[in-house]
Amino acid sequence: ESGADAGLVLQQIRQAIRFHRKFLASDQDRHKRIHWFDPSWWQRNIKKLFSRPKTAGFGYTAAAWRRSSQAVFRAAGQQKALLASPPQESTGLPNTLPLSASLGYYNLHGVPDSAEWFGQRAFNDPLIGPDYPVALTPANLRSNGHRPDVIFSEACYGANLRDEKTTTSSIALRFLSIGAHAFVGSTCTSYGAVTMPLAGADLMAYRFWKLLR
């Protein structure tokens, strides 16, 4: 974040320390409670070994890229439909929605001189409205005690922090300020596929989610 105030950086450091301390404590506690001759313990852990926990995800895409975005979202273990813009716009977006899931995937337009991310109308969309509506702004991300753990954004300039970006002028910084552990995004232009097969940023996002799982 720009300026002399290191508050956001210090917040990230404290958050990382808390996370790793909590993880270490739970790991030590788990080892203390292991009962090697307890059949129920073996049964529980064998089930865990061969099953993947379901993690809630939130996906938001430009309507023009819905098909390729859905393929990427499935790689994150998400079978539900993504939110698409249009018809969704930032003004009608519930503030709790982007913060309600552990994983956040965004395939929207971004520009270097604006804090907003934009949707894009599908070529055959009959609805009346702007071709590139504002889909998400930092104001949509209000701290409410919930936050995603990991965000992957394909937006052009989605992780661009030049030109004195702050939590009110950067969605990436806004996510981090409310407690997200990681934000993956582009500092420049980012290209993907309109439809299948996946390419460019879409393929990178697909492999990211696959490996993260």
Predicted regions and their residues:
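Structured catalytic cores of large enzymes
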Residues: E1-Q78
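Alpha-helix capping and helix-coil boundary motifs
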Residues: S2-D5, E89, R213
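Broad hydrophobic/π-residue packing in well-ordered secondary structure
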Residues: L8, Y106-H109, L203-F208
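Generic hydrophobic/packing signal
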Residues: Q11-I13, T61, L108, P148-D149, ...
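Charged/polar, solvent-exposed surface patches and flexible loops
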Residues: Q15, K48, A71-A75, N95, ...
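Catalytic-core segments of thiol-dependent peptidases
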Residues: I46-L49, P53, G57-S169, C188
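Active-site-proximal C-terminal subdomain of hydrolase catalytic domains
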Residues: V150-R213
